From Swiss-Prot:
Organism: Toxoplasma gondii (strain ATCC 50853 / GT1)
Record-given protein name: Rhoptry apical surface protein 2
Compartment annotation: Cytoplasmic vesicle, Secretory vesicle, Rhoptry membrane
Function recorded in the entry: Essential for tachyzoite invasion of host cells by controlling rhoptry secretion. Binds to phosphatidic acid (PA) and phosphatidylinositol 4,5-bisphosphate (PIP2) lipids and thus, likely contributes to the assembly of the machinery that docks or primes the rhoptry to the parasite cell membrane prior to the fusion with the host cell membrane.
Domain notes: The C2 domain is a non-calcium binding domain. Cooperates with the PH domain in the binding to phosphatidic acid (PA) and phosphatidylinositol 4,5-bisphosphate (PIP2).
Effect of inactivating the gene: Intracellular replication, parasite egress and motility occur normally; however, host cell invasion is severely reduced. Complete inhibition of rhoptry secretion without affecting microneme secretion or rhoptry morphology.
GO biological process: symbiont-mediated perturbation of host vesicle-mediated transport
Swiss-Prot/TrEMBL keywords: Cytoplasmic vesicle, Membrane
Gene name linked to the record: RASP2
Occurrences of domain PH (ranges): 230-338
Domain C2: 45-179
Segments of this protein annotated with the region Disordered: 341-437
InterPro entries: PH_CERLI1 (IPR056293)
Disulphide bridges, residue numbers: none
This protein's GO CC annotations: cytoplasmic vesicle; rhoptry membrane
């Protein structure tokens, strides 16, 4: 009996220790989470400047844009994602899948975090996502001063990651970009790329970036965002033909009329030579990334008589920057046009409208009093061809989101994707029509 009581007491003691240890661990985790969210005194502007000029801190606060290009030497046939941590800020990438025996995967994703004065390192973790649990495979620690500032924020550099679990030894290809600390970290792709271009131009000139979007007019913001859609692209028509490379640029060809113009080269564009062609932005009704090929996206646009389907292949930047940026710019341009249309017209505009109404009444055979005059018996319609410009679809209903994905598994990926887009578009249009009797 005494032995049984002794065993029961020992078991109770071990259970109490286990419960106590678990409670302590939980309490410490909660304490770390709470203290992690508390701001540091140097986040105050005056204290931060004082600490920096006294030499206590070796850098001031800034935002860093981490561009993840590729992963290499990763496990086969798995799902991976990355997390970036810097002080109180963190960001998580989307899940990328490693297919078959391939141990190299293209990521092409951007994550932005805020670096405080007190932060000395940025940590990047690589996770393997499974059905039951998630495993942390490796990590990379970048020193803010030594690896970023002193090396002038290196671009497309390979880093070997420290292995935590598994047999593979991953490495990661990164580009680091320094941005203004006043910018929000949750930016849209269009704003993010526009700010990055502006920052790079300021760095090349050796000037400080002074940019305030809130003080810009709607027209100035459109011009600022339009630079995102400038660069080389390979163009392939949906009906076949050779793939040709052009240099594209968003241009305001007339007041409030924007077109996506293209030249044979960047030099031809900058020298002011005649453009090869153009696509009105408001005539674009569909922007669709290719699901199977991260380098390709599909665009459908319209002119007066026909619709045109074109595939584009990226050259020097991620495909999503083109497709998402194109979609966002069209939405902003459409909103700007709608805002302009609600304004009170000037006297010159009112006179123009009155002249158009009078001309229309004369064509319809109305007299000045508003009553229709009898049409002459021998009258003929004018054979003069129509001179109306290309169709400007400002109210076109978007059929697909730019982030929508159309599967294509056959070797002729472009052709199958085009056929499925045609089928889905026709079904959407037919579904809106009333049944004919």
């Amino acid at each position: 009996m005494a032995l049984v009581l002794r065993l029961m007491g020992g078991a109770a003691g071990m259970g109490a220790k286990a419960v106590g240890g678990a409670c302590c661990e939980l309490g410490s985790a909660c304490f770390r989470q709470i203290t992690k969210g508390l701001p540091h005194p140097t986040e105050c502007g005056c204290l931060g400047s004082l600490f920096f000029y006294l030499g206590i801190h070796d850098h001031q606060k800034f935002n860093v844009l981490v561009e993840i290009h590729e992963l290499d030497r990763v496990p086969k046939s798995c799902s991976l994602y990355m997390t970036i941590e810097a002080g109180r800020w963190s960001a998580t990438s989307q899940v990328v899948k490693v297919k078959g025996q391939d141990q190299r995967v293209v990521v092409e994703e951007r994550l932005m975090v805020h670096i405080r004065q007190v932060d000395n390192e940025v940590k990047i973790f690589l996770f393997k996502k499974g059905l039951v649990k998630t495993t942390r495979l490796a990590n990379l620690v970048l020193k803010v001063k030594e690896d970023m500032i002193d090396k002038k924020f290196p671009k497309r550099t390979w880093y070997n990651m420290k292995v935590e679990n598994g047999k593979s030894q991953p490495r990661i290809n990164l580009s680091l970009h320094k941005l203004d600390p006043g910018l929000p970290t949750n930016q849209s792709p269009l704003l993010q790329q526009a700010m990055l271009i502006a920052q790079q131009e300021a760095d090349e000139k050796g000037e400080e970036l002074k940019l305030d979007l809130a003080k810009m007019t709607a027209k100035e913001r459109l011009t600022f965002f339009s630079q995102v859609l400038e660069g080389p692209l390979e163009r392939l028509n949906a009906n076949g033909g050779a793939c040709m490379q052009f240099y594209y640029k968003a241009v305001e060809v007339k007041p409030d009329r924007w077109e996506w113009c293209y030249w044979e080269s960047a030099a031809a564009c900058k020298e002011g030579k005649e453009k090869e062609g153009s696509i009105p932005f408001l005539a674009i009704s569909l922007v669709l990334p290719d699901r199977k090929n991260r380098n390709v996206f599909f665009v459908r646009y319209h002119d007066k008589d026909n619709q045109h389907d074109v595939f584009f292949r990226r050259v020097d930047r991620d495909r999503n920057l083109w497709s998402d940026g194109l979609y966002e710019f069209i939405e902003k341009l459409r909103a700007y046009r709608e805002t302009c249309s609600t304004r009170v017209p000037s006297q010159k505009g009112a006179d123009g409208e009155e002249k158009k109404k009078k001309k229309k009444r004369r064509e319809d055979g109305e007299d000045s009093s508003g009553e229709k005059s009898p049409r002459k018996s021998g009258g003929k319609k004018s054979r003069r061809p129509s001179t109306s410009p290309r169709l400007d679809i400002s109210t076109a209903r978007r059929l697909h989101s730019p982030r929508a994905q159309v599967p294509s598994k056959s070797p002729c990926a472009h052709q199958q994707m085009y056929e499925e887009v045609m089928i889905s578009t026709q079904s959407s249009v037919v579904g809106d029509e009333e049944p004919q009797t």
